[in-house]
Amino acid sequence: MEVEIVWLVKAAWITVWIVSILPLVIASIPSSKLNSFRELVLSFAGRGKILHPSSQKFTVPQKFFGHFYVVGVVWTTLLLAATWMYACKMAGGSHVFSFHMTHVEHRFKVGRAVFLLLLMEIHVLRRVIESFYVFKYSTSARMHILAYVGALFYYVAAPLSLCSNIAPEVARFVGSQVAEFIASGKSHSHDFNLLLSISPLMKLGSLQWIGGAIFLWGWIHQRRCHAILGSLREYPSQAKEYIIPYGDWFEMVSCPHFLAEIVLYLGLLISSGGTDISIWLLFGFVAANLTYAAGETHRWYLQKFENYPASRHAIFPHVY
């Protein structure tokens, strides 16, 4: 079962790369022969202001973005709670661990998964709050229904990718706890022990904390940039207006919130140790998808505003 889940996650990401990222790469090739293909890709991948008015068929309101993060919060919370309880059970001395590694190695592996899921939880919690209380989406802003479904899949697959190597044993642990509860009619929970609860995070290495710091750096700047974007439509009368944003990383690039997203996922990759191909595929998907979206957004800004700052790049300062 363990091998099946691990390979299922890997296969899912490879499929996502073939279906979504490969077309974006082809559409980015500067050739007039690809104009029709480029328009087709943008009709699926575009959203909001970069979605062409002629591509409104089979779309949903962009305010449905909040649905992604609700799914992300619920799913990540479940994974985090189950994995953390399993890690605490191991720390308490009652555990079943893989015979392929020592108990110390396995505890580190489980603790690292707890840390990664905790970072993801911090991320999706902020995003769901921003979706409902910070952003004021234009009533005309739309996204393709396939992009909507794909994003729902993403927020199930991404958290699972962070713990796929231990997900089967966590599932067995949860199953055994449920079976015990059903059989005995009561849970075998113990008094709360703070030291035991934080013990999964006490054995992390320097790589995890470095990655966590990079994640936090991206997280803070994304929060600031989203606050700036939200302030541009502070009043209902501004719902359909587009204004040039200024401040924080907006002084360098057109899509600093995308750059910050890539930075925080880089932090997750570093915290994971970089040994799991699923997390590499996750990071690559985020970077490729947002780089393409940033390029289209940057071109839209240049066409929309004659006084747009010439020094700004699309997403990577002084590069692109």
UniProtKB/Swiss-Prot annotation:
Expressed in roots and flowers. It catalyses: a di-trans,poly-cis-dolichal + NADP(+) = a di-trans,poly-cis-polyprenal + NADPH + H(+). The keyword Cell division does not apply. One of its GO terms (biological process) is polyprenol metabolic process. The keyword Transmembrane helix applies. It is a multi-pass membrane protein. Keywords: Cell membrane, Membrane, NADP, Oxidoreductase, Transmembrane, Transmembrane helix. InterPro entries: 3-oxo-5_a-steroid_4-DH_C, Dfg10/SRD5A3. Its EC number is 1.3.1.94. The chain crosses the membrane at residues 5-25, 64-84, 143-163, 200-220, 243-263, 266-286. GO terms for cellular component: plasma membrane. It is an enzyme of class 1 (oxidoreductase). Its main location: membrane. Coiled coil: none annotated. PROSITE patterns: S5A_REDUCTASE. One of its GO terms (molecular function) is steroid dehydrogenase activity. It is found in: Cell membrane. Pathway: Protein modification; protein glycosylation. Belongs to the steroid 5-alpha reductase family. Polyprenal reductase subfamily. Plays a key role in early steps of protein N-linked glycosylation by being involved in the conversion of polyprenol into dolichol. Acts as a polyprenal reductase that mediates the reduction of polyprenal into dolichal in a NADP-dependent mechanism. Dolichols are required for the synthesis of dolichol-linked monosaccharides and the oligosaccharide precursor used for N-glycosylation. Involved in the regulation of plant growth and reproductive processes. This is Polyprenal reductase 1. It comes from Arabidopsis thaliana (Mouse-ear cress). The gene is PPRD1.
